[in-house]
Amino acid sequence: MKKLLILLACLGISTTAFAYSNADLEKVQAGSNCVNGDLSGADLSALDLSGRNFEGTNFNQARLVSTNFNNTSLNDAKFDHALMNNAKFRGADATNVSFKYAVGAGADFTNADLAASNFYRAQLRGAKFLNANLKHIEAQEASLDSIIADYANFSNANLPYAWMYKAQLKNASFNYANLYSAKLQHADLSDADMTSAKMGKTNLRSSILANAKFNAAVLDNADLRNADLTYTEFGTATKMNTKFE
């Protein structure tokens, strides 16, 4: 038993039993707000929860497949290990939210305010972050392949070792973001602002960097082979051992 608990801990899986509050669940099912509630482990799949207030509520390990959180207040809520495939968070106020280890393929965060939220090791392949506020997010080792995040603001975001293969990031801002060793092969970063970004060992092979701005960025040991560098501006970026061909 001890060995099993150690294995679960190493995998980032909590051994705590998650039991939602029946009173909170009934409140939600009745169409009410649920501030600082406990919905951990609850199945809320496909429910329309749009426009409600869930600030500080615990959704850890909840099942939220295709759940509608559009225009909700979710500040300080927790979604650790939640299953959120195709969930909708369009226009949500979701600052300082914890999405650690959450699985949300195809989730829609268009126009959401996600500032200072934590996506550590979250799996969000194909999620939409169009025009989303992602300032100061923590997304180390997050799986963000094929996300659609045109015009999103990743300023000061922490994204080391993140997977962003084939991500659509046109006109996105990464000012002062940490993208150390991030995987951005075949990503579209045309017109993106990478000013002062930390991109040591970042993989940008075959990416589209047309009109992108890298002034004062750190590109040491980055891989830009076969990238589209049409009108790309490097300014004072450092490029020690950067691979261009």
Task: Indicate where each model-derived feature is located.
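Positively charged n-region of N-terminal signal peptides that target proteins for export
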Residues: 1-4
